[in-house]
Amino acid sequence: MRAKTLLAAIACAVLLISCGEKKEYIFNGENLDGWKTVLKDDADAITGASTFSAKDSLMRVTGKPFGYIRTEKKYADYKLHLEWRWTGGEGVDGGIFNRLQDGDVVWPLGVQLQMTPKDMGALMGGIKMDGIEGPFYRKPRVVEESPEKPVGEWNEMDFLCKGREMKVWLNGVLVNEASCDATEGYIAIQSEGGPMEFRNIYLTRSK
């Protein structure tokens, strides 16, 4: 009887959570509709055309030339979820921008979430954060065992942006948090040196 009661309580909790949040996939897995590419000024049509591509439910990034692909829409309060892996045999520099501002330059104004090996989860950028004018850099939290997975394996990142609050989880472990003066902006994925793949890119927001 107690077991049945416990299972019922768990089921109710799951139902409440699912009813309270709605997933919005910002990458459809088939093409790059809803995204805009920004590359270095000297990138020509040949080298830049395939920097970002969509195939087999994956967004693929070559890493060359430098630049990023951003959403066409701006977003305010959300929790961003995405999964990625390095595909070139070694970890490379990479990043995700949140609260990205207008301008469409290769080194934009926004909050960059570092995806570099051994610096995973660091926050940096030119926006005012924690009451300090940019440029800004906050190291990831020191944890007993790094939650980062080896090259070739899928990592999961969750990035909460709610008002001025920011929190970052890497594979379920809280690795960073800060406050940011910007409360709205684009979301972007960098091309910065080497190949990576992304999947399951979506937002959850309270209804």
Protein language model features and the residues they cover:
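Bacterial N-terminal signal peptides that target proteins for export
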Residues: 1-7
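Carbohydrate-interacting regions of secretory-pathway proteins
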Residues: 19-207
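Hydrophobic h-region of N-terminal signal peptides that target proteins for export
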Residues: 11-18
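Low-complexity, intrinsically disordered short segments enriched for Gly/Pro and polybasic residues
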Residues: 9-11, 70
